[in-house]
Amino acid sequence: MTIAIDFVGTNVGSGTKTYNINFCNELESIDLKEDFIIYLSKNYFNQIKFLENKNSRIKYIVKSNIFSNIFFRLFWMQFILPFELKIMGVKKLYSPMNFCPILAKLFNIKIILALHSNLPWVFFHLMPGNIIRNLLTRKLMEFSISACKILIVDSYFAKEEISNILKIKKDKIKVVYLGIDKKFLSSECVKNFVETFNYSEKYIISVLSCVRYHNILNLLKAFKVLINEINFNIKLVLILQILDKKYYKVLNSYIVSNFEKDEVTII
């Protein structure tokens, strides 16, 4: 049986991009028993670490970087991809990024969908973007969940939560924990060290994107309570990817007003 995977995604630095590229690299390195067709953006394809002998079980279909744009990507996914899968005789599709081609269900293609966040149902007001776009996003995610045969979430808490919210049978939902980027476990990780940072100091580290739904402001408030209540020399280090500049200004303002110099460091 041929299995298709849709890795056509954003080129913005993110957990999604890291997940997709690492997934491809892992597939390339193992002895596969099934044939795979992998759809991916050109910018992803250029970052795959092919072995000397490319995995013969994998066929790559490289799409234009224009599909890094969410609107073009969704149009292609919903109205073109299902017919491509049908023509190639694909019977199983893995969609790893919250959405899947809904029409594929009409062609008896088994869809496995990965849902990375319950945010649209739990904290809708914290979603980035305007309300109309966010409502459409949530509805399309609901249609995708309805169309899939298996839904993958990243924790048992998320499974209980989404099952209760959308009234999904729990035997449809599987839990697969997200993994760590392998580069941080290898001897090559020294290349990622920040030379100006003192690693011998005591510190708490948090790595995340700077967006409101990560609620970094509450993290800062909690850290302030911690250092005020205990006499302990420790710092907070935030490694941020700044996706929301206005929120970043709010965080900086809070840090300046509430902490001594170097108590909180942003990298």
Residues of each region from the PLM?
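Carbohydrate transferase catalytic cores enriched for Leloir-type hexosyltransferases
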Residues: 1-267
